[in-house]
Amino acid sequence: MSRVAQLDSIALDKELYGQFWSEFNAAFNTSEHKEEWELALNTVVFMCATRFLPHYGSSCTYGSALSGVVFQCRKRTLYVVTVLAGYVWKKITHIIFNGPHCGNQMMWLKLYKWVNLLYHGCDVTNFLRFLAAEGPNARAFLSPLYRAFNVHSTRLIRDGSAIASEFYSNSVFAGLEYQNRQLLWNALLELFSNTLLTKRGLLTFVKKPPRSRSTTTYKTVCPRCGGFPTNPYQIACCRANYCYVCVVKALEWSMCDACGSSGRLTASPVY
């Protein structure tokens, strides 16, 4: 079965729990006994999902039902690995890091770090085995905790045949369609930026109105930067003096800042 669907089921559950918790936390003061409040809320969400969703002989969460994935285990086992285990780990972490830093506490802290490192190593190994699992009889475990409790995920079966969640399929196709539109839009923007929106292509259609300064002013003031012309060049259309850098820009854009002329401009050094 699709490995992406199994991973998406976990991501959907985390997003659901996080959304409910953020709304609950904004409405009520949960500064005291925060972990217990979160456990109670996640338990209610889990019970509602497992009670009212169709199971077809298996256990499933809200996210797994949307992605067409079920778990071959009992509901209480699925509750332990999806909800209760996270609460227990948070409480252990809270006790170890917030306890008094005595001799026993430092020993527990070292043990915690070693257990955490060992779990992450097992998690990497389990993920590689999860990706390599093939065949209809292969068991896929989403984490070492799932493997320890023998909670493996399979495809949702109805009437003897595997079915795909319509919501999940539509979500995947909608995501692909959105990415295709983004690629097309980026290609159009790149086309415009390389053709119509270039300085030469755009400024040929835009003519600046003539400046009100007199010709004598442009002999001592660069019409582009407003400073004294450094290494001056005189443009042929109105004989205004430009700085060298400014006249290069004016010739590149084919637009005179002094008189608004456009087209094939030329300039020559004053001295």
Curated annotation (Swiss-Prot):
The chain crosses the membrane at residues 3-29, 34-60, 78-97, 102-133, 176-197. Residues 30-33, 98-101, 198-271 are cytoplasmic. Zn(2+) 1 binds at residues 222, 225, 243, 246. It is an enzyme of class 2 (transferase). Zn(2+) 2 binds at residues 237-238, 256, 259. It is a multi-pass membrane protein. GO terms for cellular component: peroxisomal importomer complex; peroxisomal membrane; transmembrane transporter complex; ubiquitin ligase complex. Signal peptide: none annotated. The keyword Ribosomal protein does not apply. GO terms for biological process: protein import into peroxisome matrix; protein import into peroxisome matrix, receptor recycling; protein import into peroxisome matrix, substrate release; protein monoubiquitination; protein polyubiquitination; protein ubiquitination. Component of the PEX2-PEX10-PEX12 retrotranslocation channel, composed of PEX2, PEX10 and PEX12. Present with 339 molecules/cell in log phase SD medium. Belongs to the pex2/pex10/pex12 family. This is Peroxisomal biogenesis factor 2. It comes from Saccharomyces cerevisiae (strain ATCC 204508 / S288c) (Baker's yeast). The lineage of its organism: Eukaryota, Fungi, Dikarya, Ascomycota, Saccharomycotina.
